Amino acid sequence: MTKELIKTEASDHVIQPNNEQFSILEQLKKQQEELLQKQRELFLQDQLAHHQQQQQQQQQQLQFQQQNQLQPANNWTFTQGLVLGQISVIFIIIVFVKFFVFADSSTIPTKKSSIDASGIIVKRNKLTKKDGTSDDIIEDEKLLDTRHKISTILEKTYYDVNNHSPESLDWFNVLVAQTISQLRSEALLGDNIYHSLNDFLENTNIPEFIDKINLTEIDIGDDFPIFSNCRIKYGEDLGRLEAKIDVDLSDTLTLGISTKLLLNQPRPLTAILPVSLAVSIVRFSGCLTVSLINTKDIDLKNIEKDGQENDGSNNENEDGGGTALMFSFSPDYRLEFVVKSLIGSRAKLQDVPKISSLIESKLRTWFIERCVEPRFQVVRLPSLWPRTKNTREPINKKTSVSRSDSGTSENL
């Protein structure tokens, strides 16, 4: 009995570790199965990822092939592209220079109008005549435009025509005196004034009963005119600014002539009457009106036509337009003459009043018809634009510079 009991216990003892091993083996199997399952899953994932990569590569290759089929193959190198770019730039420059800088002469229009310069010249106070506008309205617009220009000039020069005090013009007197002095020197140089007046008298048509006229006395004076009391006024009727200047000249300007009156009745040279005359201007004073005008002015043309002279003077209204200086004297001027006359050879008549009054009347009429208001004189002004042919340089400056250069060279 004891042996059997011992065997049963021993058998139980032997069986029990086998069960534990079995459980351990089962766990190991489960773990192996789990590992195998994980390895299979990882392998499947790797296969799937590899398959996806292959599909992406195939798609990229297909896209690249499609792009290559759509776009032509570009086999240009960098050097070839650079050369092509330089050639294209040079070609563009040549085309620009040819067609934009050097234009063809045949394409340049020969006729130019004021409209071509409308985009270049800044025009202010522009007047345009519209269709259907009467001449009176145009004249009113021009008058308003002129008044606006004058008011702008006075405003920008800070000059009040009503309250500004008169100016003395001392500086202007000096310039006029220098000019007159130079003219006198040129007139007296080589007896130029004598020859000029003598040629004028010889070429003048004189009546048959007057013999040759000879010059006996010429005096161009030694004094100068004095300008003073200058004031700027606005001419309401003319629509322009005028300078009113008082002029005073006290000098002696004398011209003496001698001739003979020929009595040709009843036969030629029946009698000869010598005549000697000397006319002197001793005093002149008056108010001088000076203004700048345009020779294309309509009022100026009408006045010139109405006051056209018969002495062969040139018609300035036929010339082109431009700036001119207009001057005239007021009717209340003062002009004094001294006329000396001597008639006869043996029994002489000296200073005949009738002859003096006749000569003085003729001279006053000549002056009134030309320079007294409403008549005026128009002097066209030359172009003041700087030109090379009018450029001068003092010679003394060059000599002084050369001397200074020579002195410096000697010092060196």
UniProtKB/Swiss-Prot annotation:
Residue ranges annotated as transmembrane are: 82-102
Top-rank taxon, per record: Eukaryota
Kindly list the places in or outside the cell where this protein is found, as annotated in its UniProt entry: Endoplasmic reticulum membrane
The Polar residues compositionally biased stretches are 397-412
Spell out the residue ranges making up region: Disordered: 389-412
Q: Where is the SMP-LTD domain?
A: 165-382
Matching PROSITE patterns? SMP
Q: Which InterPro entries match?
A: Mmm1 (IPR027537), MMM1_dom (IPR019411), SMP_LBD (IPR031468)
The record places the following residue ranges in the Cytoplasmic compartment, namely 103-412
User: What topology in the membrane does the UniProt record assign?
Assistant: Single-pass type I membrane protein
Main site of residence?
A: endoplasmic reticulum
Q: How does it assemble?
A: Homodimer. Component of the ER-mitochondria encounter structure (ERMES) or MDM complex, composed of MMM1, MDM10, MDM12 and MDM34. A MMM1 homodimer associates with one molecule of MDM12 on each side in a pairwise head-to-tail manner, and the SMP-LTD domains of MMM1 and MDM12 generate a continuous hydrophobic tunnel for phospholipid trafficking.
Give the similarity note. Belongs to the MMM1 family.
Domain comment text?
A: The SMP-LTD domain is a barrel-like domain that can bind various types of glycerophospholipids in its interior and mediate their transfer between two adjacent bilayers.
Function according to Swiss-Prot or TrEMBL: Component of the ERMES/MDM complex, which serves as a molecular tether to connect the endoplasmic reticulum (ER) and mitochondria. Components of this complex are involved in the control of mitochondrial shape and protein biogenesis, and function in nonvesicular lipid trafficking between the ER and mitochondria. The MDM12-MMM1 subcomplex functions in the major beta-barrel assembly pathway that is responsible for biogenesis of all outer membrane beta-barrel proteins, and acts in a late step after the SAM complex.
- Record protein name field: Maintenance of mitochondrial morphology protein 1
Q: Which gene is this protein's source?
A: MMM1
